[in-house]
Amino acid sequence: MSSIDRSQSAGGTRTYEVRTYGCQMNVHDSERLSGLLEDAGYVRAPEGADGDADVVVFNTCAVRENADNKLYGNLGHLAPKKASRPGMQIAVGGCLAQKDRDTIVKRAPWVDVVFGTHNIGKLPVLLERARVQEEAQVEIAESLEAFPSTLPTRRESAYAAWVSISVGCNNTCTFCIVPALRGKEKDRRPGDILAEVEALVAEGVSEITLLGQNVNAYGSDIGDREAFSKLLRACGNIDGLERVRFTSPHPRDFTDDVIAAMAETPNAMPQLHMPLQSGSDPVLKAMRRSYRQERYLGIIEKVRAAIPHAAITTDIIVGFPGETEEDFEQTLHVVREARFAQAFTFQYSKRPGTPAAEMENQIPKAVVQERYERLVALQEEISWDENKKQVGRTLELMVAEGEGRKDGATHRLSGRAPDNRLVHFTKPDQEVRPGDVVTVEITYAAPHHLLAEGAVLDVRRTRAGDAWEKRNTAEQAKPAGVLLGLPKIGVPEPQPVVASGCGCD
């Protein structure tokens, strides 16, 4: 029996809680952290534990300005709990831990473990070492020790899964610290990726999202410029895989073969999230983004020609150093031309260690706020107009879990359309489970969701729904002390603090 196993036997079942901040990469890493801890004998704390678990892990983000304040505020909240509970441990990982390795324990000496983005597999060992040695363990690897997809994973969903195809980023955007923290791009072999997808489908997963910091640069390791489009097409040949998505691509690497693969692969969903960041050529140059407005709008035009019903979303940064009113108007121009379904908008924030932080002509906060509000108002209007075009359409939805905050009160359920729009629909008499597919007619549009208020036209029970039911039944059958039961459909579970775009793609 390992020392970790012995500690669990001696002290009884120990619980854990993982708190996630940042992008989808962190969400997937948190699934691995949960898998590692459960593999080591820990069990998940009940929802709403709020720091009452025996081990609390923070998986942090370093992109936004308030990331530091958020972390240390949460750590301060846990300090009295830890002081009153011998044996409780706190671990900090992710991008902020990679960046602030030397200061976290100084500012919060009650933290037990600090680990980085390259060695998440060490967490159980570091926790045990901190317990035995009774001192903080700070261990940051400078490069990837093993591709994280080899680690055990506790997936949050029984019917949808992330699949990493690469880690790291070779771009040098002046506002972004991620490449310094996640390292250079490293690609997985196509055979390993497809084997993981096939294994997930065998478990009942029917939707996968191919994940990378710059997903369509995939293949740079092997010198194959069309590797990503080939991977998309290969996913189209996997029986039982109904939906394939990917995030996030970079406009520089968005080639015609990728557009063709999206259009011609039956299970590739009509959805594209492609960060814009700015519509101004001078600002894009200062950002070191390696494309210009004409190139970006040209990609949008080609995608819409090949996939007319595609929903296109983006990331935009407002108030980059040196941004003039004319520059900002160019961003508004692109937003009007592209007609994004949604835009994840961010106010520029200085990140120490990035070239942009040292640039002259930092924009006053009041100016940034005013521009931000104008951009949000414009995009809100466009999002609503684009959603109104969906009214009257008949759509197949994959029933989702925890997507609708008011589902229980309104007797509705929620699902995702092929283009990833959120749809709330009337709960049918027939039982439906997350992962099942329903056919509905859209009757109403709001800026951020659609409604299907009539009767459901069809219900298709799926292997994904079977997988959800099997896991839910197994979780509810666990002993009461473990408390791992999943919420029932229609009742939302707390979601990690995640932005669909983090401004770093």
Swiss-Prot record:
Role summary: Catalyzes the methylthiolation of N6-(dimethylallyl)adenosine (i(6)A), leading to the formation of 2-methylthio-N6-(dimethylallyl)adenosine (ms(2)i(6)A) at position 37 in tRNAs that read codons beginning with uridine.
Species per Swiss-Prot/TrEMBL record: Streptomyces coelicolor (strain ATCC BAA-471 / A3(2) / M145)
EC number: 2.8.4.3
Protein name as annotated: tRNA-2-methylthio-N(6)-dimethylallyladenosine synthase
Cofactor: [4Fe-4S] cluster
Top-level taxonomic group: Bacteria
GO terms for MF: 4 iron, 4 sulfur cluster binding; metal ion binding; N6-isopentenyladenosine methylthiotransferase activity
Keywords: 4Fe-4S, Cytoplasm, Iron, Iron-sulfur, Metal-binding, S-adenosyl-L-methionine, Transferase, tRNA processing
Binding site residues for [4Fe-4S] cluster 1: C23, C61, C95
Domain annotation MTTase N-terminal: ranges: 14-132
Record GO cellular component, one term: cytosol
Residue ranges annotated for the TRAM domain, each copy included: 388-456
Domain Radical SAM core: 155-386
Pfam families for this protein: Radical_SAM, UPF0004
Residues involved in [4Fe-4S] cluster 2 binding: C169, C173, C176
GN (gene name): miaB
